[in-house]
Structure formats: C-alpha cells, structure tokens
Design a protein with these regions (language model features):
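Active-site microenvironments that recognize anionic phosphate/pyrophosphate groups
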Residues: 1-129, 135-190
Length: 190
C-alpha cells in the first residue's frame, strides 16, 4: 500500500472538483459529471500486490493485500453533502454503486465488497469534497463472517432466515426503527 504517500492538498484547490481550465489529458475528473468513479490513486489494496514484508511468525501471519479501491464522487459540488442530494441524484449514485459492486464481484480474488462514505477528520479523510470509496477485499472481514455463520446456524436450527426474523421483531416492538417503507427497513440494532 502506498497510502502514506497521499499528498497534502493546498486549501484553495480540490482534485475532485471539475476544472475546465485544467487541460491535462490525464486528469481524472471531467469538466462535467453527476457521479463519478475512478481507481484510487493511493489504494490500500492492489490487484497486483507486492510480496508482504517478511515479518510473519508462527503466530502472526501475513499475506498479499490483493483487492481493489475505487473513489466515488457524489457530486461536482465541493460543499454539498449526501443528505442534500436530490432523490434523482441519489438514484444515479446508487446505480453506480450497484454497477461497480457487480463488476468487482466478478473478480474471483475478491470475496467482499464494501461501499462506504468517506467523510470527516475522524476517519482520516484528506479531501473534504463529498465522496465515498468502494473496497474489494480478498477476504471476508471476521465480523461479517461471524454474522453469516450465526445466520446459517439460526437457519439450520429453526428453518427461518435470521434477518427476516430480526425485521419482524423490530416491526413488532417498533422501538428502534429509523425508517421503513414497502421496500426496506432501517433500524438501530438491539
């Protein structure tokens, strides 16, 4: 990974903003876009990863960090936020996420695709422009693996889908639901 080589950007310039005055033929951001995806210039994962440092022990294991990292620009508006986007614009963003997810999952090396918003100093964001990332990992994170194992065990024991049961329980008690419509339900976990 070469993430430590990320540059500190001047405060009055943003590489994610459209800039018609920039005539560089290799620039990543076009003069006009609604939503945009491109490969991260400073990825944490690589489709051609180098051999890991020889620091493994019998206890601590290392492996190549195979994967893919993409940047997704939500809008050309430098000061906009995801919550301020119109429904139509959010539809374009979600469609792009689905497209990229479907392309990434075709890589047999990628076992888990993670789409997330990249915002705030707390998570180490160096660019304030509204954007997210899509990571394709060569391993399923342990937390997700454990959740899937629990769901399978529940199904094996009861014959029912764990997540469907959780949804029914939340609808019944109606204490933690954030939003619900005919297509989905969002709630704070118990």
């Amino acid at each position: 990974s070469n993430r430590q080589n990320r540059p500190q950007m001047p405060k009055d310039w943003c590489p994610f903003c459209p800039d018609p005055s920039n005539k560089d033929p290799h620039k990543k951001v076009p003069d006009h876009f609604d939503v945009l995806e491109y490969d991260n210039d400073f990825p944490a994962l690589s489709q051609n990863p180098p051999e890991p440092d020889d620091v493994a022990t019998d206890f601590y294991k290392v492996r190549k960090s195979h994967g893919k990292c993409e940047v997704v620009l939500y809008s050309p508006d430098h000061h906009g936020t995801l919550k301020e986007l119109s429904d139509e614009h959010i539809r374009k963003l979600v469609d792009l996420w689905v497209e990229r997810f479907n392309l990434m999952k075709k890589d047999p090396e990628i076992k888990y695709v993670f789409i997330f918003e990249n915002r705030g100093d707390e998570v180490g964001v160096t660019m304030p422009h509204p954007h997210g990332q899509i990571y394709g990992y060569s391993v399923v994170p342990k937390k997700i693996e454990l959740e899937l194992e629990a769901a399978k065990e529940h199904h094996d024991e009861t014959g029912e889908c764990l997540f469907c049961r959780m949804n029914k329980e939340e609808e019944t008690c109606n204490l933690r639901i954030v939003h619900e419509n005919e297509d989905f339900i969002a709630y704070i976990p118990f």
